[in-house]
Amino acid sequence: MIHRVSFYGKTTWFTKQHLIDWFLCLGIFVIESVLFNFVIPPFKRYEPESNISTNTFQLVQYPLLPDIVPVWLLMLIALGLPMVVFIGYYIKNRNSHDFHHAALGLFQAFTITMLFTDILKVSAGRYRPDYGARVATGIEAVIREGRVSFPSGHSSVSFCGMTFLSFYLCGKTKVFLKDGGNILKALVCLCPFMISALVAVSRTVDYHHDFSDILAGSVIGLSIGVFVYFMNFNSLFSKECSLPKNRINPHYARDGLLSAEYQSLSISSSL
């Protein structure tokens, strides 16, 4: 039996800065959730008093329907699904370094995405397509939700989590290296994008967003997912693409530990 040598046992990678990152992300998430949901009201746009036949107001007269993808399911997709993959990979390889950076990176991406999305939502104050039906309910919380259409939070959050997961899979399958990938690897790596695209499109089907809302949200989530992934993992085009970064020893891949890390982070070539 070949003994797997974990990189975690070879060198130190965890620093005080990682703890600071965790607490900062948690603090930012809590503060922005309170501020933009309970303290800061959305920008109040002009509402025609009587002439609801204007082109602008005709666009917000769609029926009020339940979410096709409720918030709990969105969180399960954007955060739960990647975590299942990270945990499964940890169980297989026993690499704490990789698991920590994957979990931290996902939380960082989620926090930054929520911050950007909520700031833009209250700043734009755009009416949802079902705003008229929300006003008819007379419920203040429902009406308020009708004024935060741009950008789509479902789109930004789903693309954030799925982009991070897709890049994680690309790194582990080494799909961009010189020897190339295959159709199965490509499908595995691209599957998260299809999931996030379906979540985004569902927001137009239930009349909670326009296409411009979901497009903006998708760009935000995708951009932040890519940005944060490369904060924590190496380039997908390098030989170290499957490895997490190391703040204590940035050049650990050149210091004789790379073979041990590769052995710890190996993935089946049968994909």
From Swiss-Prot:
Membrane topology: Multi-pass membrane protein
GO biological process: phospholipid dephosphorylation; phospholipid metabolic process
Organism domain of life: Eukaryota
Bilayer-spanning residue ranges: 23-43, 68-88, 102-122, 150-170, 181-201, 211-231
Matching Gene3D superfamilies: Phosphatidic acid phosphatase type 2/haloperoxidase
Gene Ontology cellular-component annotations: membrane
CDD domains (UniProt xref): PAP2_containing_1_like
Subcellular localization(s) per the UniProt record: Membrane
Pfam families: PAP2
Entry keywords, A to Z: Hydrolase, Membrane, Transmembrane, Transmembrane helix
GO molecular function, one term: phosphatidate phosphatase activity
InterPro entries from the UniProt entry: P_Acid_Pase_2/haloperoxi_sf, P_Acid_Pase_2/haloperoxidase, PA_PP_rel
Family statement: Belongs to the PA-phosphatase related phosphoesterase family.
Protein name listed in UniProt: PA-phosphatase related-family protein DDB_G0284367
Species of the source: Dictyostelium discoideum
